[in-house]
């Protein structure tokens, strides 16, 4: 229950019985201690970015994590916003293996939407609720160095598909992120990388989040989606997946489309030492807090073994 979604009875924080308040705090306390001083990377996307109630709730949740001593780092997507902007200029987005085909005009739109409109909206909301957020792209402090992605052609082994200005991460320089964390700021990162000659590249936000979690030695990577987690072919939630099970789901086509880079990045992060990797339903209010601060099993956990 929360103040944003009142039922027939009063459900404001003030109306919650003292015993229940104490129970909520008691459940959260071990997790606050466990993650105090730790970096939590959050991939923020989907409905949580487009529905007003969820947007405001996310901003407050991130601030709370910071206030209790954690170091949240937000990596955001913006697919629906990019699609809408492309529609206005008469273009339709196309995808290959979950990656957006990005010609020169599309790249200009991506830069404007992600590095401008979407990022500024997130930063503004966090600051509006009393947090201190700073927006970054890959150019800031040399954060994300990228090169053109070579997309393997699955039907022609050894061949590659040209999908334009889509980036492959060459290196991440975490200095600017760590400096912001040390000064109590919340970094909000747009998934745009840059080559040494200044060419901008559109990078899948899941890929950036996974690599950022690895480089920052994050305790936890949480990916917010528009589904409950990873689903089997019958629509059942898979709550726990090992590397072997993920490979089987890739092979039989259960994981496809936009889930391919998401699950690949989650698995890579787990293999690289990120202690906890979860894919959760961002359509649920305060799902981020439920995942981090409660015992409730939520979404899909990705394991490296």
From Swiss-Prot:
Entry binding sites for substrate: 78-79, 100, 202
One matching Pfam family: AA_kinase
EC code(s) of this entry: 2.7.2.8
Location of this chain's protein in the cell: Cytoplasm
Keyword flag Repeat: no
Catalytic activity as recorded in UniProt: N-acetyl-L-glutamate + ATP = N-acetyl-L-glutamyl 5-phosphate + ADP
Pathway: Amino-acid biosynthesis; L-arginine biosynthesis; N(2)-acetyl-L-ornithine from L-glutamate: step 2/4
Keywords for the protein's UniProt record, in alphabetical order: Amino-acid biosynthesis, Arginine biosynthesis, ATP-binding, Cytoplasm, Kinase, Nucleotide-binding, Transferase
Annotated site (Transition state stabilizer): 43, 262
InterPro entries registered for this protein in UniProt: AceGlu_kinase-like_sf, AcgluKinase_fam, ArgB, Asp/Glu/Uridylate_kinase, NAGK-C
Any one of the GO CC terms: cytoplasm
GO biological process, one term: L-arginine biosynthetic process
Gene Ontology molecular function: any one: ATP binding
First-level EC class: transferase
NCBIfam families per record: argB (TIGR00761)
Job of this protein: Catalyzes the ATP-dependent phosphorylation of N-acetyl-L-glutamate.
Family membership noted in the UniProt record: Belongs to the acetylglutamate kinase family. ArgB subfamily.
Protein name: Acetylglutamate kinase
